[in-house]
Regions:
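Conserved ABC transporter NBD signature motif
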Residues: 60-68, 77
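Helix-to-loop junction immediately C-terminal to a conserved catalytic motif
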Residues: 52
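Conserved ABC ATPase "signature" region
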Residues: 113-131
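Conserved ABC ATPase "signature" C-loop
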Residues: 213-214
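The feature captures the beta-strand-to-loop junction immediately N-terminal to the Walker
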Residues: 37-39
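Conserved ABC ATPase signature
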Residues: 135-139
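Catalytic Walker B motif of ABC-type/P-loop ATPase nucleotide-binding domains
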Residues: 160-163
Length: 276
């Protein structure tokens, strides 16, 4: 499988002199849904901001679909990497939902017909097509986050980065977000999710990158990383609750690497059937 993102010996120091990333090496395959996890200050967002050239390496190299991100402007990288910020207020400025979502395609030089088509498709994906004339700040926090995502999807990037996309979402919003991630994977997009919610990561992501103090300390399948509490503890991260339960019940034959409630339910049902 081809690489969507390649990070080689990446080190970054902020102008203050604080070192935020330390010799990070990482390959992300095309079409994967990958979570960046770790406690606050671990370097997750700093790393992700190198993907679209919001930050330039102090040393090392980041390539996205073969493009050296440090040699392109953020506006040039917008065709390749869409970045959805954690706080929608940092991203929204249009007076209507349609104006907000149409800005990106229009800025990329698309004509009026193509711009409208891209905007409507993106709004349909996130469930906001009925709100095209609504002012963004008349919407709920969760809807505004979905609007930011639509604004990014309208530019049809190859890679989508989402910073805490599940924060502020109700049950319906979380279900919709899961459906969107599945759809992005189905059409070949690479998605990078920054999250502190391990239950969400377990359900929606297939690979996990664990960071601590600017270093990458583990990269592997979601099951492999989330079912290893000692490794997660290095960055003050706890496994999903159901995984902690599975580990506690492992002496009774429950697999310790269960990471979702659905897996636990299936395991217990099968165990009950066998004991009858």
């Amino acid at each position: 499988m081809s690489l969507a993102i390649s990070v080689e010996n990446l080190t970054y120091r902020y102008p203050s002199g604080r070192q935020a990333l330390r010799n990070v090496n990482l390959d992300i395959e095309s079409g994967n849904t990958v979570a960046l996890i770790g406690k606050n200050g671990a370097g997750k967002t700093t790393l992700a901001k190198h993907f679209n050239s919001l930050l330039k390496p102090t040393s090392g190299r980041v390539t996205v679909t073969g493009i050296d991100a440090s040699k392109r402007s953020t506006s040039q990288m917008a065709r390749v990497v869409g970045y959805v910020f954690q706080n929608p207020e940092d991203q929204l400025f249009g007076s209507t939902v349609m104006e907000e979502v149409a800005f990106g395609p229009k800025n990329l030089g698309m004509n009026q017909e193509e711009t409208r088509s891209k905007a409507e498709r993106a709004l349909s994906i996130v469930g906001l097509l009925p709100y095209v004339l609504e002012h963004p700040y008349n919407m709920t926090y969760g809807q505004r986050k979905m609007l930011c995502l639509a604004s990014v999807l309208a530019m049809d990037p190859t890679v989508v980065v989402m910073d805490e996309p599940n924060a502020g979402q109700d049950y319906h919003g979380l279900r919709l977000l899961g459906s969107i991630l599945e759809q992005l994977k189905r059409i070949g997009k690479t998605t990078v999710v920054i999250s502190h919610d391990m239950e969400f990561v377990a359900r929606e992501c297939e690979k996990v990158v664990l960071m601590h103090d600017g270093k990458l300390i583990a990269h592997g399948s979601t099951r492999q990383i989330l079912s290893d509490p000692s490794r997660l503890a290095l960055s003050s991260v706890r496994p999903p609750q159901v995984t902690r339960l599975a580990i506690g019940l492992s002496s009774r034959g429950v697999p310790p690497d269960i990471i979702t409630v659905e897996e636990m339910a299936h395991t217990l049902i099968e165990s009950t059937r066998k004991s009858v």
